[in-house]
């Protein structure tokens, strides 16, 4: 097993998938069948993917309606395939043009799924309300991001990307240290801490609902490899023995302990790091995941998400995962991030050049430029 990154407590959502060709040949072990592995447990091994596009939350007007009609799915598929502006780009050479390098013309579109939302509990398909403290924390982060954007055309034109912030001169707080651990892209580029986790080649949170999942089973552990797209991904190991470590031990994707309940693999994950939050939840997050083999090509996945400091009630997601060809959809064993490895350094070089031009009177104030959205 690869060594996992440990840290001590107190230290401080449709994705494009990129494929790589590796030589992978599955060799059945003695006693293993299509449905059962050599230890007599359900065989969950393989590459699995949710092949449908499903809204994360249900539209409020649908109420408790769990499924769409064939006519609704056909209409949505038609709208996606012919959506205006899919080939739109910014002025050649502009920041908007460069940042939009992943033109939608070259991305695939999943067909619309039968469910009206991934969220199945509560019955209305909506994530429960935030606690007052979580809402306050979200507002504090939003205010900080907007503060760094206030002198840009984005806020001057009152576009949605300004998140309702006012237009005005650069804030005197723009050089301050953020009052929180940043995981999102900001309109400042002093160092890696100002960049998003994706820019820093640390994309992917647990749980993940978008990319491929490769499941590999052992006698006392189950490994799950995630491909989160564009050369990024991560590995998780759910141990079938032992207990969670002490509370002060924190892991990027938490500590996962699994057990079998008849034909279902149940994984409980705790001990998450504050540096890798899921929708604002981290150190108090608990996940209960359930993997159930439905048939040869179908795996049902359900996860219950609970953090009483963030949401007023637990909530659950359900997906139907389909087996993918091992030969046609091979994914990373060790994720790379070539764009980030080169792009992050280039971003800082460009930021320093802009600062030099401004100090010499040859260019605009960098804080008057939107280098975030």
Where do the model's predicted regions map?
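PEST-like low-complexity, intrinsically disordered acidic/proline/serine-rich tracts
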Residues: 2-6, 24-373
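N-terminal Sec-pathway targeting helices
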Residues: 6-13
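Bacterial N-terminal signal peptides
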Residues: 13-26
């Amino acid at each position: 097993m690869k060594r996992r990154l440990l840290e001590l407590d107190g230290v401080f959502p449709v994705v494009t998938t990129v494929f790589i060709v590796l030589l992978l040949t599955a060799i059945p072990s003695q006693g293993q069948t299509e449905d059962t592995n050599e230890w007599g447990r359900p065989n969950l091994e393989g590459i699995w993917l949710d092949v449908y596009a499903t809204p994360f939350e249900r539209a409020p007007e649908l109420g408790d309606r769990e499924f769409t009609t064939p006519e609704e799915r056909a209409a949505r598929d038609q709208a996606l395939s012919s959506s205006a502006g899919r080939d739109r780009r910014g002025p050649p050479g502009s920041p908007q043009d460069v940042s939009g390098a992943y033109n939608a013309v070259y991305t695939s579109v999943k067909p619309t799924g039968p469910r009206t939302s991934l969220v199945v509990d509560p019955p209305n398909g909506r994530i429960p309300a935030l606690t007052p403290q979580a809402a306050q924390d979200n507002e504090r982060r939003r205010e900080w991001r907007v503060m760094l954007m206030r002198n840009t055309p984005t806020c001057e034109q009152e576009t949605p990307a300004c998140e309702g912030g006012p237009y005005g001169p650069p804030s005197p707080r723009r050089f301050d240290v953020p009052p929180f651990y940043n995981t999102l892209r900001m309109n400042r580029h002093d160092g890696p801490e100002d960049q998003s986790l994706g820019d820093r080649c640390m994309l992917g949170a647990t749980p993940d609902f978008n990319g491929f999942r490769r499941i590999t089973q052992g006698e006392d552990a189950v490994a799950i490899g995630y491909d989160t797209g564009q050369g990024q991904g991560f590995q998780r190991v759910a141990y079938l023995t032992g207990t969670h470590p002490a509370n002060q031990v924190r892991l990027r994707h938490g500590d996962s302990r699994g057990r079998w309940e008849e034909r279902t693999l149940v994984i409980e994950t705790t001990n998450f790091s504050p540096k890798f939050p899921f929708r604002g939840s981290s150190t108090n997050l608990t996940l209960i995941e359930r993997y159930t083999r439905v048939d040869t090509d179908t795996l049902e996945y359900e996860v219950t998400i609970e953090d009483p400091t963030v949401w007023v009630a637990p909530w659950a997601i359900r997906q139907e995962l389909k087996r993918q060809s091992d030969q046609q959809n091979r994914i990373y064993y060790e994720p790379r991030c070539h764009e980030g490895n080169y792009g992050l350094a280039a971003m800082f070089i460009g930021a320093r050049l802009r600062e030099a031009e401004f100090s010499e009177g040859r260019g605009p104030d960098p804080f008057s430029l939107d280098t975030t959205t």
